[in-house]
């Protein structure tokens, strides 16, 4: 009987110990479940942040694409301005050639009409005025060409900076892909994900700064194109004035030649 009682007591003690272990394991299981739920919540929060960053990156890409489109439009406008300047150069060159021929005829008429000193002096004065105007037009056209060269340089500089922005954007996308892979590993990767999110945020700020600079350059291009358009109008007006002056000089030369013929 004593042996049975001892065995019963031992079994009861073992049962109590087993129940204690079961309670302990159940508590540990609950704690593990709580930690797992917390980890899942943190992962969901991290994924939500990643989605938000992806949305911001999509917006940044759209804004960058729009800025590139505007820059292309400005480059086309600059090319059109260059074409107009070239056409204006050709228009000015023709009156200059006519002016040279008229000057030769005027010099001949002046030599033959030495007696008509008053008419010859007036023709010489007109010739000098036209020469001065021609030189002034050439100087202004040179200045306009220099401004166009500067505008092309600024456009090339803008392309280079936008290439740099595109490279940084590709780096950000690569960082995001790696961050998504690390997010799947659970709680141990959350700290690394948060650090990468901070890096992505800094890159987004850099993109925003680059976009703001691009907008500023766009406004500068608009002002330059407006200035070039005004200068083109002024140059065209000067060219028309030069053409009228050449026509007037041609008439004067014809008149002097007629007088010379009549005197002979």
From Swiss-Prot:
Similarity comment text for this entry: Belongs to the tropomyosin family.
Record-given protein name: Tropomyosin Cha f 1.0101
Organism encoding this protein: Charybdis feriata (Crucifix crab)
PROSITE patterns in the record: TROPOMYOSIN (PS00326)
Keyword Isomerase tagged: no
InterPro entries: Tropomyosin (IPR000533)
Record note on quaternary structure: Homodimer.
Ranges of biased composition (kind: Basic and acidic residues): 12-45
């Amino acid at each position: 009987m004593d042996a049975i009682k001892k065995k019963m007591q031992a079994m009861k003690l073992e049962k109590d110990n087993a129940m204690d272990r079961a309670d302990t394991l159940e508590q540990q299981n609950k704690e593990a479940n709580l930690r797992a739920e917390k980890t899942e919540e943190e992962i969901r929060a991290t994924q939500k942040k990643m989605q938000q960053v992806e949305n911001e990156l999509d917006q940044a890409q759209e804004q960058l694409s729009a800025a590139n489109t505007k820059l292309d439009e400005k480059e086309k406008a600059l090319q059109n301005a260059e074409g107009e300047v070239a056409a204006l150069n050709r228009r000015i060159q023709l009156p200059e050639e006519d002016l040279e021929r008229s000057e030769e005829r005027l010099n001949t008429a002046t030599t033959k009409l030495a007696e008509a000193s008053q008419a010859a002096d007036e023709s010489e004065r007109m010739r000098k005025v036209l020469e001065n105007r021609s030189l002034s037009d050439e100087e202004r056209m040179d200045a306009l060409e220099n401004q166009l060269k500067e505008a092309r340089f600024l456009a090339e500089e803008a392309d280079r900076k936008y290439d740099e922005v595109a490279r940084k954007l590709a780096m950000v996308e690569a960082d995001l892909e790696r961050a998504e892979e690390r997010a799947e590993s659970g709680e141990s990767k959350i700290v690394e994900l948060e650090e990468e999110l901070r890096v992505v945020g800094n890159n987004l700020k850099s993109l925003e700064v680059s976009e703001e600079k691009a907008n500023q350059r766009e406004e500068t291009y608009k002002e330059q194109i407006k200035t070039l358009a005004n200068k083109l109008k002024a140059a065209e007006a000067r060219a028309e004035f030069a053409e009228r002056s050449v026509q007037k000089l041609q008439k004067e030369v014809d008149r002097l030649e007629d007088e010379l013929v009549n005197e002979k």
